[in-house]
Amino acid sequence: MPINYTNLLLMLRECKNFRCLLQVHGSLIVSGLKPHNQLINAYSLFQRQDLSRVIFDSVRDPGVVLWNSMIRGYTRAGLHREALGFFGYMSEEKGIDPDKYSFTFALKACAGSMDFKKGLRIHDLIAEMGLESDVYIGTALVEMYCKARDLVSARQVFDKMHVKDVVTWNTMVSGLAQNGCSSAALLLFHDMRSCCVDIDHVSLYNLIPAVSKLEKSDVCRCLHGLVIKKGFIFAFSSGLIDMYCNCADLYAAESVFEEVWRKDESSWGTMMAAYAHNGFFEEVLELFDLMRNYDVRMNKVAAASALQAAAYVGDLVKGIAIHDYAVQQGLIGDVSVATSLMSMYSKCGELEIAEQLFINIEDRDVVSWSAMIASYEQAGQHDEAISLFRDMMRIHIKPNAVTLTSVLQGCAGVAASRLGKSIHCYAIKADIESELETATAVISMYAKCGRFSPALKAFERLPIKDAVAFNALAQGYTQIGDANKAFDVYKNMKLHGVCPDSRTMVGMLQTCAFCSDYARGSCVYGQIIKHGFDSECHVAHALINMFTKCDALAAAIVLFDKCGFEKSTVSWNIMMNGYLLHGQAEEAVATFRQMKVEKFQPNAVTFVNIVRAAAELSALRVGMSVHSSLIQCGFCSQTPVGNSLVDMYAKCGMIESSEKCFIEISNKYIVSWNTMLSAYAAHGLASCAVSLFLSMQENELKPDSVSFLSVLSACRHAGLVEEGKRIFEEMGERHKIEAEVEHYACMVDLLGKAGLFGEAVEMMRRMRVKTSVGVWGALLNSSRMHCNLWLSNAALCQLVKLEPLNPSHYSQDRRLGEVNNVSRIKKVPACSWIEV
């Protein structure tokens, strides 16, 4: 191509990269040609405003065209303040009259910088010059006013325009849709078609969010038809899927997804998000498998949806696979993906991995902090959640409603009402309390801390009292065991004209379960059927749980077998737990086997239940088989699973295996240490128990009453009197833990077996709690062992007073004749069996 002015300008327009632009610029300099305007525009396309400015400054008296090029370049690069500065300098300092293009670019800069005061001044200048009706200026004014949420002014400008092109109509429709005026946007679109404006892809694209918010399937189908007619189906597939999802028409969304023969990453991500939004998590994971098989690039929407699904079903193996694929796709650096990963691992019980992911996030935003606080809260680590919230506040990251909701739940968990009150005050100052979610969390926090006066005040301040607020207040009363007041709240809910939702029914069932109130539970069941909630899974789960807690296992079995709801892993877990509560471990094992036959995927809770069943049956072979499955699934390091394995092996006589499982637990909380202490105590390994007890304190873990009971029990079995006395004194003096009747029974038995009856009786005399059968029984056994007849008779007399209908007390004193005089005594038949 010969080098001339025309060819060089053509080459300048066709530059695809910055290096090519520099070469063409060099050729222009060599040729002595200076197309300043074209060069400024070219450098602006590569966002090199510094070089554009050098060229501009080299011109002695730049005209309005060059000024416009600079203003447009700054606006295009997002440097809106600089663009407005140039506009002001041109018109005010240099005295150059702006033309319609100057005004258009300046108004776009006002919209981009949200400087609407400047925009109003420019509008006044436009009106003075009589340029309001110009199609370019008018469109820019409409866009600016829509960004300012001043739809009245935008519509006035729009209506004054004599000539409107498709861009003008699209801008007005988009402005209405983005500001929540969906119906107005749809009406304007109809006007647009009535005016015979040739709609383009932008017209339809702007309308999709408006139609989505209307949630009308017939309107969705009309828009879908227009998209097909215009031939935009491929480009609009993601938007259509999202639109149908918002209208709860998942079947139509699936049809769009399947009809698109060339699916891009956006289509896959939107479809997965649609499934996740509607609770179809198994389908999300199936799509993920297909996406991976087809080697489709995964975007962050798909990654977040897949991780959410894995977390919900508790499938850690699948979650790890999604993590690996996200790493391959280079998504791991994205904050939203890292936050989703963090949530998935925490919900699957791998809190340590979640913590590490949180630490590795470089630019932690409020969402990341909130997710980690929520993770601690879900794991029951209320103190850690509160501590992290304090760290967040220390580095001046402003919490949102989600953050405050989680940390208020943490305050409720540790009964930290003073801190909860401080957070409540912060929510009021930050104007977050008015958000219903936060207000409900405040009510729940006060109620669960037993502070019903501020809870009721917060409740009364609510402008709109919905079912969620009533539920939160009622659950507070349930937690303190006041079923009557909880049901009074539910009655007031009806008086206020608030319709109960499914969560209300679940709350009422939880109250009945907590108080073992079968009669009320049956009435609630009737209300559930009346309102049509019986087919909802979480309601059915609460029903089964209520029946098992109210000694109505037969009713729970009937409900589970009838299956008026869709069974899930959760429902099988509840049924297994019900059998265990009623001492039917064999049925729990049978339920687990049936669950596997029906192809349900067990989660961590399932494994905890089956390991508990194996422990109760001392069925070592079953326990070892489950342990093998746990290793394959990667659940062994999870705290609840690890605790159950420690207990199972201890009850099956394999204390070495218990120790190994204890070591493998990644996060050892107080329950883990107590389980291992109990195992040592049951096996009479007092020295191991004491050593572990000391190690526990060295790890800065404060022992609780259960810890002391376990180590005292171990000392009792081994006859370690001095060690037991030291630990008992340490419990009250150092750790400020009030001794309970079980602790006294241990000490009386320990002292009595050592023949220290004086100390044993003195301890009983100094007891701050009422003596029980356990304490007198311990004294009776030890006194009989040492042939102390006077003391054994005294202990026996007290036992008979406490439990006159217990035949064992009479038989111990060889008063077998008196047993026949005791009426209505039933003895559970004994049995013996072997594991087959």
Curated annotation (Swiss-Prot):
Q: Where are the PPR repeats?
A: 1-35, 36-62, 63-98, 99-133, 134-164, 165-199, 200-230, 233-263, 264-298, 299-333, 334-364, 365-399, 400-434, 435-465, 466-500, 501-535, 536-566, 568-602, 603-637, 638-668, 669-703, 704-734, 740-770
The UniProt entry's GO biological process terms, in alphabetical order, are:
RNA modification
Query: Listed GO molecular functions?
Result: RNA binding
Tell me if Repeat is a UniProt keyword of this record: yes
Q: Where is this region: Type E motif?
A: 775-836
Question: Where in the chain are disulfide-linked cysteines found?
Answer: none
Q: Which UniProt keywords apply?
A: Repeat
InterPro entries reported in the protein's UniProt record: Pentatricopeptide_rpt, PPR_At4g14850-like_plant, TPR-like_helical_dom_sf
PANTHER family, per the entry: PENTATRICOPEPTIDE REPEAT-CONTAINING PROTEIN
Similarity section: Belongs to the PPR family. PCMP-E subfamily.
| The protein's name | Pentatricopeptide repeat-containing protein At2g39620
Organism from which the protein derives: Arabidopsis thaliana
